[in-house]
Amino acid sequence: PMTDQKTYTQTPWSLKDLYDSFDDPKYQETFDEIKRGVENFQAYREQLSPDISEDLFIGMITTYEHFYRLMSRLDGFVQLAFAQDTQDQEAQAAVAKVDQFQAEMSNRTLFFNLWWKGLDDKNAQRLLDASGDFRYWLVTMRNFKDFTLSEPEEKVINIKDVTGVRALNMLYDSI
């Protein structure tokens, strides 16, 4: 038996759950909120020590998680907008802006990753035991400690990736 065939008109997906547009004030405000979060996080640098309290440590990584989620939202928005139309100049510029912003923010919080990877196993285990849902992320980060460079070198790599690998990938995606 034949069934009735229906025709559907393809429409672009809506990104309004993230932001209304690149001109959306909330989109612009997210950059500022991330900057404030990173500045607050940087204040923890002086408090990092092997005997840091579990509560302070959890507070730190909760702060980190908050601005990281915001960064993921920004990145998701620009990447989806770009995927919608790889020839869209505004989307291309937004991807480049967010990539650069991510590298800058990553460089400003890199101290934590390096401290965590360099922490002795006994204190790392103590903090892992208190870390709850953050445990997997923290364990994964420590797995890369043998492949981690100094802070200045890691910062150069972050910036290089924006103009190197990521820029090349974007070029290929545009073609």
Q: For each predicted feature, which ranges?
A:
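A well-structured
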Residues: M2-I175
